[in-house]
Amino acid sequence: MKAVLGLEDGTVIKGTGFGAEGTACGELVFTTQFTGYEEALTDPSYKGQILMFTYPLIGNYGVSGERFQSDNIHAEGLVVREACKKPYHYKSTRSIHKFLEDEGKPGIEGVDTRMLTIGAREHGTMRAALITGSDDGEEAVDMARNFPQVTDEELIARVTCKEPRFIPGAAGAWKGSGKPKHAVVVDLGIKRNIINNLHKRGIDLTLVPATTKPEEIAGYEPDMLFISNGPGDPEKATDAINAVKAFAGTIPVAGICFGHQIISLAMGARTYKLKFGHRGGNQPVKDLIENKIFISSQNHGYAVDADSLEGTGLYVKYLNANDKTVEGVSHKDLDIFSVQFHPEAQAGPLDTEETFFGKVVKVLGGGL
């Protein structure tokens, strides 16, 4: 099947299509993950983006569905050097080609992904259009140029839950005095493994939509407010920002990735768009308090401005060891903390899982 990838700067790359026949538009981003394509494609944080893998062969072990981070593919399309035609794994039920086809998502292979990655690092991420069933480069470039910027898109509404949902903590798992604690989780596109990590520690959860007002959250009588990961520009998550403002100082507040940015904004800091973002499972972060290095899984295109933290009560807890951007903050006096990386991994290393989720349990009075 014919396929073409067009970028807003006029770059045209022709290749071979796989998956569904059709068109995908979005911001072209790259990840350095070697594996974990099931998790990445189903991560709601990739909504509005075309995902490109730098690793040259993707799909080797097929698709099982056991590690999906949501029910569906959220990336708009897939760009790879080569898609494996004959995957093998005893749990595999279909190929990556069939997975994309079933989900109505296009893919393109035969692409020099390293060249595109270097271009993104030098010039920044760009809007792109991926067309399968056609190799009309001019059409692809026009579509890319006319597609909205990520800052203009309303992505959160496309991934948040529609109704509140209660998830009881795992029976007998809460290690603390009294009954299990209850966290209200603002769902901005939460990954399944974040839910799993809170659940397996015995914490009762109420997932609420992104537009939930502070007074509605208060009605659930939470012991903690938790802000999830999600796609797009954090400044658009105004309801979540207002929720943090309302509960900061009254109950513990924690967040991951997008949630980290929202907490920082709510406390008075600023965020900015990175040139090409951090995406992959090999990102080193330094704990400035413990003087330790961890390898983390990351997926974000925005970061918190370190200089803007002055006067907010927040301090930098974690720093990216590569580019020195903020990877986590804590409050000097209040139980407010967040990380930019993904301690729950899926995919990626588990170096920081217990560090982060153990702290969640601790501030709730558990871990005794």
Swiss-Prot record:
GO molecular function: ATP binding; carbamoyl-phosphate synthase (glutamine-hydrolyzing) activity; glutaminase activity
Record region (CPSase): 1-178
Keyword terms: Amino-acid biosynthesis, Arginine biosynthesis, ATP-binding, Glutamine amidotransferase, Ligase, Nucleotide-binding, Pyrimidine biosynthesis
Pathway: Amino-acid biosynthesis; L-arginine biosynthesis; carbamoyl phosphate from bicarbonate: step 1/1; Pyrimidine metabolism; UMP biosynthesis via de novo pathway; (S)-dihydroorotate from bicarbonate: step 1/3
Disulfide bonds: none
InterPro entries: Anth_synth/Amidotransfase, CarbamoylP_synth_ssu, CarbamoylP_synth_ssu_N, CarbP_synth_ssu_N_sf, Class_I_gatase-like, CPSase_GATase1, GATASE
Enzyme class: ligase
Catalytic activity entry: hydrogencarbonate + L-glutamine + 2 ATP + H2O = carbamoyl phosphate + L-glutamate + 2 ADP + phosphate + 2 H(+)
Residues of the Glutamine amidotransferase type-1 domain: 182-368
GO biological processes: 'de novo' pyrimidine nucleobase biosynthetic process; 'de novo' UMP biosynthetic process; glutamine metabolic process; L-arginine biosynthetic process
Residues noted as binding L-glutamine in the record, renumbered to the chain: 45, 230, 232, 258, 261, 299, 301-302
Active-site positions on this chain: 257, 342, 344
Annotated SUPFAM superfamilies: Carbamoyl phosphate synthetase, small subunit N-terminal domain (SSF52021), Class I glutamine amidotransferase-like (SSF52317)
Signal peptide positions (record): none
Family: Belongs to the CarA family.
Function per UniProt: Small subunit of the glutamine-dependent carbamoyl phosphate synthetase (CPSase). CPSase catalyzes the formation of carbamoyl phosphate from the ammonia moiety of glutamine, carbonate, and phosphate donated by ATP, constituting the first step of 2 biosynthetic pathways, one leading to arginine and/or urea and the other to pyrimidine nucleotides. The small subunit (glutamine amidotransferase) binds and cleaves glutamine to supply the large subunit with the substrate ammonia.
Known partners and oligomeric status: Composed of two chains; the small (or glutamine) chain promotes the hydrolysis of glutamine to ammonia, which is used by the large (or ammonia) chain to synthesize carbamoyl phosphate. Tetramer of heterodimers (alpha,beta)4.
Protein name: Carbamoyl phosphate synthase small chain
Species whose genome carries this gene: Methanosarcina mazei (strain ATCC BAA-159 / DSM 3647 / Goe1 / Go1 / JCM 11833 / OCM 88)
Gene name of the record: carA
